[in-house]
Every structure is written in structure tokens, then in C-alpha cells.
Amino acid sequence: MIQVLRNAQVYAPQSLGVKDVFIAGSKIIGVVDAGCEFELPDGVEVVEHDVLGRRLIPGLVDCHAHITGGGGEDGASTKVAAPLAETYFAAGVTSVVGLLGTDDITRSTEELLAGVRALREEGLSAWCWTGGYHYPLTTLTGSPREDIVHIDAVIGVGELAISDHRSSQLTLDEVLRTASDCHVGGLIARKAGVLHLHLGDGKRGLDLIRQALEQSELPARVFHPTHVNRQRALFDEALELTKLGCHIDVTAFPIEDGDGAISAADALREYLASDLPGNLISVSSDGGGCLPVFDEQGRMVKYDVGTSASLLEALNDLTGSGVALDCALPAFTSNPAEHLRLDGKGRIAVGYDADLVVLDDDGSVASVFTAAETHYKNKN
């Protein structure tokens, strides 16, 4: 069967104009001007969907999501339930990378891998980081390098915590050893081999990453700090790291007055207005994770829960303020897909996976296609 999305305003993520997109199996086989001829085999069933001029974008790539649920920082009653697959589809997310956070004790790598399989069975593309906040790392094989090499779904280590009172207070040697395992494991397995680092509010900021780059031969792409928009000073440090070749990740968490954080939309808006490399920034959701507030003694006083819907909210914030969709979109699609070597993801082009999202005029998700199946349709 061939499926055709007719009359779509395609952002691939670059703007291509109004196109017809042809899909066979799980792959895009043609992107042509609307109404133009496209040769198809005789006798093949063709199913057409008229998009009616709406915007068609690649499925969003969320590289930081608690697919088995996060939380637990104030006892077991504060553990967050695992988000359903429908949650991701409704947010326009078709590719997700799961992880463990603070609680890498009662939650396990085994559970995380089962979560990846469950999402794949529901039609999502899913991977995971091995490890969690703490060192020594929680792994399946006993070695992060072996997890990366031997387990298909594992693309690197994360979210290993630094500059945070909940971290293992890592030394430089421990960071270097872990980053080396990521790098070499990635080389052997042809994977990203990335060390995905949780950044807290600690005054040391990104100092461990700077030291690691200064005192080792490891390439900058191995170090992937996230939550870098949680403080102004931290974001300034992160901008400097991109000049060395590091890829940085901002989080689309809610912002409260006086907490010092920068919204994902504001952070990306600032980044895009600079002369920094456009491919070295991504936006993730922390979906399913606990977003806690602690007192001065490190006790949690309240928390919120992250959601993948925050990605589309940030994207709409950007476009609503005048940022062109094709400028904003790479940070949500092609940038994370290419940095993490998620082949076939993040673009609308021949040979890529047919992970496609149709947007309504108001920026909400109208429908989602993955592997030629419709996984979500807005009921409104």
C-alpha cells in the first residue's frame, strides 16, 4: 500500500512549500510539488489524505523523557507514573529517549528497557540512556560500555548528575572514565556514544566539562549537558561550550518569577539570534519527570511534573513571537536526531522514516503518522 499526504505545507525542517508526500511501508519515497505526477507501481493500493494546506513537520524528537516515570524525592508516594504512549503522540513526539533520574534504586535499567519495548509496540520510536544520576552507574551488564555495545536501545549514558546536591559529587577522573566508556562504546557499536549530563543549580556549573575537555583527548560532542537554561549564568557557560563543539540541551520546563531560569523558548530565541552553530542546540521536555523545589537544607517542598506537551508549547511560543518555523524546528527535530545518530529521524526527505505531524492553524497537533499508521487525530 502507498499512502499520500496531499497539499501539505512541508517543513522538512526547512520550508519546502506545498508538496505531496508519498509513503511506502515505514519510509518516505517521494516529496514532490503538489499535483505533480509521481510514478507508482501498477496495481498497488493508494490511500490519500488531503492535508488541506496545513503544515507538515517531522515528528518531534524528545531526547530526555522519564518513560517509566520519575520523582520519588520525598518518598515513594511522590513517584510519578509512567506517561502513556498517547501522551507523546498528542504532543507531536514520535521519537523519545528514556532515562532514570534521582531514583535509580527502585527504578532499574531492566524496567527502563521494558518501557522502551512497550513504547515501540505502541508505534513510537524509542531508545534509552543507561545509568541515572549516580556513580557507580546503574547498568544491565555491569559496564556502561558493554550496555552501549550489546543492547540495541542504549545510545549512551544519562542523566548522570553534576553540580547538584543529589549527585554522587563526581570527581574529574570519574567523569572522564564514564565519558571514555561512552565514546569507545559508541565507536564499536556505531552509536552516538554520548554522556548526557544533568545540571543542577550548584555553583560549579559546567566546570567539570571544561576540565574534561582541557585535560583529555575526548571529543567535545561526547559531552551533552541538559537543563542548561535553569540559571542565567549556567546558560552563559553553556553558550561558551558550544564554541568548543559541545551540543547543549535546554529543557521546556515551566518558569516561575524569581527562580532565575530562562524559558526554553527564550533560550532558543537568544541562541538563534547569535552567531553560534545552529546545529548544537536541542530542546527536550523532561516529560514524566519530577520538577522539584528544595529548601536550603535539600528537602523537597513542592514539585510539578514534566510533560512532552511542553515541546510544542515552546515551539508555538517561538513562532508566535515571529521566529520562522523553519528556524526554530531543527532544535526539536533534526538537531537531536543527528547528534544522537537516530537514523531516519528528524527530517522529511526520501529514505527517511515516515514520522510526520500535521499541525492545525493554531499550532496544535491535528494528526500524527508513524510507519504509515495514523496514531493520533485531534477529535476537535
Residue positions per predicted region:
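Histidine-rich, glycine-flanked metal-binding segment
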Residues: 2-3, 10-57
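C-terminal cap of metal-dependent C-N hydrolases
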Residues: 8, 25-28, 345-380
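Divalent metal-coordination and catalytic microenvironments
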Residues: 8, 26, 53, 64, ...
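Metal-associated gating/positioning segment near the N- to mid-region
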Residues: 43, 51-114
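Divalent metal-dependent hydrolysis catalytic cores, especially in the metallo-beta-lactamase
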Residues: 83-136, 152-165, 187-201, 221-226
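Generic structural signal for hydrophobic
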Residues: 88, 116-119, 238-241, 271, ...
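Active-site core of metal-dependent hydrolases
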Residues: 180-292, 300-302
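His/Asp/Glu-enriched, well-ordered alpha-helical/loop segment
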Residues: 273-358
